[in-house]
Amino acid sequence: MALDGENRDGGSASVRVLKHCLEDVDSISSLPDVILQENLSLIPTKFAIRTSVLSKRWRHVWSETPSLDFDDCYKLDVDFIDKTLALYRARKIMTFDLWITNGINLPYIDGWIKFAMSRNVENLFLSFDFRLYDVPDYLYINSSVKQLVLGTESSELNPRCSVSWSSLTKLSLFSDESIAKILSGCPIIESLTLHFCDQLMVLDLTKSPSLKILEIHGSIWGSGPKHIVAPHIHSLTLKTSQFFIYFCDISSLTEAKVDICFCSLKEIKANFLLDTVLKCLYKLQNVDKLTFGANFLKILSLAEGRGLPFPMFKAKALTLETTISKYVIPGILRVLQNSPELKKLTLHTMDREARTMSFHFEFVESEILTICFYINEILFCSSTG
């Protein structure tokens, strides 16, 4: 009898749990479609479609989500994408994300992009991890796209027609071909990001008065543009390998984040980098908000060790993204000594161990506060990546 009682109790508990789960599902299902669709748009489309088996209520909810996300990492085939687009009901697509790694799908890509454009897509993300794809001319003429990411490092980005992206405000490219021609067709562009554009010699943004944000990300082997003329930008993010960059005009700059890519101090050409980094510093001396990365600080420490002169900075806020070590401390202290108007200092470190963080506090108390008594606020941040 005791055993029967246990079974009855266990069965009752299972029924209660099941009832509770069903109530949770019902409460979610009672939400308006627009809320459900916003949530489904946060996951890859393949997973969003699976909710159609939950109940009759969910059968078509996914088909009007504002976003479609096709990621080849999830082994999507042509039939799946074609069927998904055929069943999709929304008249407008906010975000269309297409990442294709298999060249077998090459003949179908144009059709998928045309579908997104026919629904007046606003945010278009295209990434192709193979060669031979030639970006079609029709893509260069569009009035609905506001944000465009062309992750086609190995593909051709060479428009044979005029470029007309009349609504585009944010552009990210993995190719340095035809930059001037592309920008000429972006009258209201506000943000430009360039990845691995190592062959670009001169980046002239004089004719883009609305462009306020510029990001340049190089690789360990490449360098990025050699000369930058950007009189209108307010925010600059720069991470290149050899730092072969000369700023011809960044007179409107108010915020800058800079670092260098290299694996070891032994690999760099110290004398050349010292010269170019210090020239960079002088161009940044009037910027309000500065962020320096670990490798950049290492070069500054070399400069300090050789007694080279540093400019005086007008920065009100300074962020240091580095682990505190003997390789960066001299550069940090020199920058702080030359920043009499500094009000806020942020130390963003990769270390999360209590012992290391304790060392950071000691460093601040013994070194930074001694020379920077005028700082109003010091923040510590940590992360693992």
From Swiss-Prot:
Cited Pfam families: F-box, LRR_At1g61320_AtMIF1
Domain F-box intervals: 25-73
InterPro entries named in the record: F-box-like_dom_sf, F-box_AtFBL13-like, F-box_dom, F-box_plant, LRR_At1g61320_AtMIF1, LRR_dom_sf
PANTHER family reported in the protein's UniProt record: OJ000223_09.16 PROTEIN (PTHR32153)
Protein name: Putative F-box protein At1g49610
